[in-house]
Amino acid sequence: MRAKNTEKIVPNYEELSLDTLLFKFNFVSLQSKFMRSVKIKEVIDALEKFAPLPLQESYDNAGLQVGLTGAEVSGALLCLDVTENVLNEAIKLGCNLIVAHHPLIFNKLSQISDKDYIQRIVIKAIKNDIVIVAMHTNIDAAAGGVNFKIAEKIDLQNVRFLGKTQSVQTKNGEVIGGLGVIGELTKPLAADDFVLLLKQTFNVECVQANQLLRRPIKQVALCGGAGAFLLKTAINEGADAFITGEMHYHDFFGYEQQIQICSIGHYQSEQFTTEVFKSIIENQCKGVVCHITKINTNPIIYI
């Protein structure tokens, strides 16, 4: 059998004709032409298609916060909160779009000055042509949104909405949203093992909890952020445990051996929201480079 010649053949471009070289150049140019640029508005449209603004709570201010959306996206920085450090990070990375979970502008602004960090961010974002958009309670309520991501992290099965659902009509058709989710663990856990699972999954040193449940935990309800309003619904739906980000002192009273309450921290409960943003943008807006912020914006420290 004749041995194969494995020597790498290097083309001699000096021997290529001018027509061949021009063809190669035009082919590359044609490829670049069809790699369509994406406008900021298209990214926002993709996010709002997934989580329409009508799903947000009446008190909320989700949606566009700052800027003009007609420019091409140079990069998207994804975060929970927009702080001055996050804005500086976007500038350093060359991102002209910041997608945040919590709205920068929540209350009415009566002036734009350097009085506080919100106003300073607005001014600096405009100066640097950076658009800021927030996806808040609309993506909390969306199917596949924040609460579904939390459920995924602790491997809940048969996940469905916990509280009331609503249907909104959009140009893309009907979208269903709801409050919180409920699902089942793959196997029952003792209460102390369940708390350990939360500590490991959400990288928290402590969990605020009521008296540990003496029966196994199988069915789990949850709501990211401040979800105490869904506690009684969780009990009515037969949940063994309820996870949320924060609760008031008096919310813990009266449920001993009825349900395991676990408050893991507002920031900690919503920390994976940026993964939801990234998935939407990369699937719907091909070519847009997404960066998840490296800045921990949690204003609460544990000493």
Predicted regions and their residues:
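Polybasic, lysine-rich low-complexity intrinsically disordered segments
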Residues: K4-N12
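Intrinsically disordered, low-complexity terminal tails and inter-domain linkers enriched
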Residues: I9, F27, S167-K171
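Short, positively charged and aromatic/hydrophobic N-terminal segments
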Residues: P11, T20, K24-Q31
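Short polybasic linear motifs
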Residues: L16
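Active-site catalytic microenvironments in core metabolic enzymes, especially phosphate/sugar-handling
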Residues: F34-I303
